Amino acid sequence: MSTFDLTQRMAPFLDLHLIIPLLEFIEPRGIYDEKSLTEMHRQLLTKTNMIDSVIETYNGKPIPAAIEAKKKQIIKERDELKSKVDSVVAILEIPEVKEMMDNNRERDGNVRILEHLTQNHNFTVDMVDTLFKYSKFMYECGNYTVASVCLYYYRNLVNQADPNYLNALYGKLASEILLQEWEHARDDLLKLRAYIDANPFDTEWELVTQRAWLMHWALFVYYNYPKGRDEIIEMFLNQQPYLNAIQVLAPHLLRYLAVAVVTSKSRQKNSLKDLVKVIDIERHSYKDPVTDFLTCLYIKYDFDEAQEMLQKCEEVLSNDFFLTAVLGDFRESARLLIFEMFCRIHQCITIEMLARRLNMSQEEAERWIVDLIRTYRIEGAKIDSKLGQVVMGVKSVSIHEQVMENTKRLTLRAQQIALQLEKGRQDKVKAT
């Protein structure tokens, strides 16, 4: 199943600390060679300051002298930074200062806070730099609680033109993700998105790249947040700039968008058609059992292959860090889609035939279908108990809807071509 594992494709868009949980998830699943994966895990940890975690990977074997020396250096640097930052934090934790930060909503609020600290508490610009260095160091050590608090302070002291402002936004978000504080993580995600959408970057390509990064980080939040899957649909599918970024830089994100759409109770019906179009367009650059399931069902109308793909989807989702928890929802929703499409294609089908396909008695199948229609409000579905049939009404598509859909498709393709041209231009610049 390593064929469908996306860890290597996603890693370039993630911070090292966010890659580590993905490796820890796949290690016991036997997807890759255990020794090589353990070594990769150790190499990643070595690039951070989580030196105790590095030592644990040796499992009682002799620790290299370089690792022991690095541990001493980290402890020394931590103590030096802490001695400098203690006085800074003491000022920032004064009740009146904390209140100003908590109530900071205005665009120029950071300037006013810094002016207040400078005038009333002997605060200096060097202290701001010390705070950022300590925040970054503690994050690298895996102390995400301290990093989160210090980055919160830092974010309230500098303006958006500060060279470390974007790094602070990402660092705060990563800290909350790794602490599994999903409410705070969502707030930080929205702040980061607002900053990126304001486009403070030099080139269009840099903006597209930042959006691709943001969507990868958003998976941690939205697949752990109530109604987060609806927010994935809104961001990944309904916002054209983000959809463009998926198509140009990260088509593998279509897996997560597809699962979000299939399992969404409120947005599935309105989003499936647009999703299938995107999957069809991107089939040449990305496909997996999840996208192939929808292709078989809505483009090929091959129900036997769709059922085969659904079985593969279960294995894919069970080995996916983000999707393993929604496997049950996906299975239930996917079966419903097969049933609904099968009935709609045939318009009229006997309950006896459905019972055979579902491996149920005729009475059980009829009750199951009644529950489906009642629970999911399947449009146009009716049961004729006397004839033992399920009848699906036909929904006509107006000329206006057809024109709108074709216009949307042309717009999508035009924007994608423009981004591909920009990518080609950037590649030429790098080559010269």
Swiss-Prot record:
Domain PCI: 221-401
Record keywords, A-Z: Cytoplasm, Initiation factor, Protein biosynthesis
Main location, first listed in the record: cytoplasm
Subcellular location: Cytoplasm
InterPro entries: eIF3e, eIF3e_N, PCI_dom, WH_DNA-bd_sf
One Pfam assignment: eIF3_N
Entry's Gene Ontology cellular component terms: eukaryotic 43S preinitiation complex; eukaryotic 48S preinitiation complex; eukaryotic translation initiation factor 3 complex; eukaryotic translation initiation factor 3 complex, eIF3e; nucleus
GO biological process, one term: formation of cytoplasmic translation initiation complex
Tagged with keyword DNA repair: no
A GO term for molecular function: translation initiation factor activity
Keyword Protein biosynthesis: yes
Oligomeric form and interacting partners: Component of the eukaryotic translation initiation factor 3 (eIF-3) complex.
Family affiliation: Belongs to the eIF-3 subunit E family.
Purpose: Component of the eukaryotic translation initiation factor 3 (eIF-3) complex, which is involved in protein synthesis of a specialized repertoire of mRNAs and, together with other initiation factors, stimulates binding of mRNA and methionyl-tRNAi to the 40S ribosome. The eIF-3 complex specifically targets and initiates translation of a subset of mRNAs involved in cell proliferation.
Protein name: Eukaryotic translation initiation factor 3 subunit E
Organism: Caenorhabditis elegans
